[in-house]
């Protein structure tokens, strides 16, 4: 029989546990643990000090309890991956193994709003082991993250509707664009100081497309792709909905004479809808032949560039420095090209960057700390966030897997 050190602990039998106990110097407990209570490798890993003190074991010697638990804890640290796969937290004090089932159950009733304590009272247990996690190199506790595909579908529908509504608002503001002879471009420090580069705006969209392809690859390979897509759609839709409001209420003059924008009147609602569909289907990009006027406050291109950059850097490991640097370079160069092309005022770009980054950070701060569950007011102020995130427990770990099933020939080759 192979020794315990030569065999995966999943395959340990009671005989292997007996050998391990003897090696650790616990001869007197071989009979009660292995013969009477049939402890194998997996059950040995989940052994706690409470188990040793309580029936049916009831070990009376305190020194033996402590020494045995020290040996078990060493074993748990060696086989931490096995514990995590089983959903146990091995970092709780006193060697206790706290299953995450109870945490998930508590999340359900909190998600439904049935709190058993004062909602506005002090927040407790937010720093407990079950929520400790940092994306990157640090270890994290394993949680079951339900993909909830139906919510992801709803978020996709939401963002497509918002994009369609944004396209229609862009048609409306094009009709109301101020006359260039009466309302010349507003003074702008950057635009007045930097000469226009004609090809710069096309380069902005190239930067955006590269970022989009990088994000799609990350999304495809990420284990929790459904949650990531849901968050992207909800955030992108919310920012563009705010953009609709700012575009509609105030019409800024054209930022440059090169644009040659004039108010264009569409005769009927159907013509407006047809033009809105053309903008929507072309993603509002000049590379697809879409040219718009009047949609200045704030920059939609900056929103897309910044949002994609933040999602790429958030949902990839911190050690991927090259990818993060590339993402930021594309984001910042894309913003520079927008201004260099004189397609937007500087304030358009600044406001777009600020709103996008703040909304992203606020959303993920609430999602990662679970603080919103402790306040009824948070659910009132952020209803969509509460709906989409109520069953997501803490930070989403950066885990990757191949999304497609292996072909039969590959399965035979690699087993």
Swiss-Prot record:
<dbReference type="GO" id="GO:2000303">
    <property type="term" value="P:regulation of ceramide biosynthetic process"/>
</dbReference>
<feature type="transmembrane region" description="Helical">
    <location>
        <begin position="153"/>
        <end position="173"/>
    </location>
</feature>
<dbReference type="GO" id="GO:0005886">
    <property type="term" value="C:plasma membrane"/>
</dbReference>
<keyword id="KW-1133">Transmembrane helix</keyword>
<dbReference type="GO" id="GO:0046513">
    <property type="term" value="P:ceramide biosynthetic process"/>
</dbReference>
<dbReference type="InterPro" id="IPR001660">
    <property type="entry name" value="SAM"/>
</dbReference>
<dbReference type="GO" id="GO:0006686">
    <property type="term" value="P:sphingomyelin biosynthetic process"/>
</dbReference>
<comment type="similarity">
    <text>Belongs to the sphingomyelin synthase family.</text>
</comment>
<feature type="transmembrane region" description="Helical">
    <location>
        <begin position="277"/>
        <end position="297"/>
    </location>
</feature>
<feature type="active site">
    <location>
        <position position="348"/>
    </location>
</feature>
<keyword id="KW-0812">Transmembrane</keyword>
<dbReference type="Pfam" id="PF14360">
    <property type="entry name" value="PAP2_C"/>
</dbReference>
<keyword id="KW-0746">Sphingolipid metabolism</keyword>
<feature type="active site">
    <location>
        <position position="344"/>
    </location>
</feature>
<keyword id="KW-0808">Transferase</keyword>
<keyword id="KW-0472">Membrane</keyword>
<keyword id="KW-0256">Endoplasmic reticulum</keyword>
<dbReference type="Pfam" id="PF00536">
    <property type="entry name" value="SAM_1"/>
</dbReference>
<feature type="transmembrane region" description="Helical">
    <location>
        <begin position="322"/>
        <end position="342"/>
    </location>
</feature>
<dbReference type="GO" id="GO:0005829">
    <property type="term" value="C:cytosol"/>
</dbReference>
<dbReference type="InterPro" id="IPR013761">
    <property type="entry name" value="SAM/pointed_sf"/>
</dbReference>
<feature type="transmembrane region" description="Helical">
    <location>
        <begin position="347"/>
        <end position="367"/>
    </location>
</feature>
<feature type="domain" description="SAM">
    <location>
        <begin position="12"/>
        <end position="78"/>
    </location>
</feature>
<dbReference type="GO" id="GO:0000139">
    <property type="term" value="C:Golgi membrane"/>
</dbReference>
<dbReference type="GO" id="GO:0047493">
    <property type="term" value="F:ceramide cholinephosphotransferase activity"/>
</dbReference>
<feature type="active site">
    <location>
        <position position="301"/>
    </location>
</feature>
<comment type="function">
    <text>Synthesizes sphingolipids through transfer of a phosphatidyl head group from a glycerophospholipid on to the primary hydroxyl of a ceramide in the lumen of the endoplasmic reticulum.</text>
</comment>
<feature type="transmembrane region" description="Helical">
    <location>
        <begin position="201"/>
        <end position="221"/>
    </location>
</feature>
<dbReference type="GO" id="GO:0005783">
    <property type="term" value="C:endoplasmic reticulum"/>
</dbReference>
<feature type="topological domain" description="Cytoplasmic">
    <location>
        <begin position="368"/>
        <end position="415"/>
    </location>
</feature>
<comment type="pathway">
    <text>Sphingolipid metabolism.</text>
</comment>
<protein>
    <recommendedName>
        <fullName>Sphingomyelin synthase-related protein 1</fullName>
        <ecNumber>2.7.8.-</ecNumber>
    </recommendedName>
</protein>
<dbReference type="GO" id="GO:0005789">
    <property type="term" value="C:endoplasmic reticulum membrane"/>
</dbReference>
<dbReference type="InterPro" id="IPR045221">
    <property type="entry name" value="Sphingomyelin_synth-like"/>
</dbReference>
<dbReference type="GO" id="GO:0033188">
    <property type="term" value="F:sphingomyelin synthase activity"/>
</dbReference>
<dbReference type="InterPro" id="IPR025749">
    <property type="entry name" value="Sphingomyelin_synth-like_dom"/>
</dbReference>
<keyword id="KW-0443">Lipid metabolism</keyword>
<feature type="transmembrane region" description="Helical">
    <location>
        <begin position="232"/>
        <end position="252"/>
    </location>
</feature>
<dbReference type="GO" id="GO:0016020">
    <property type="term" value="C:membrane"/>
</dbReference>
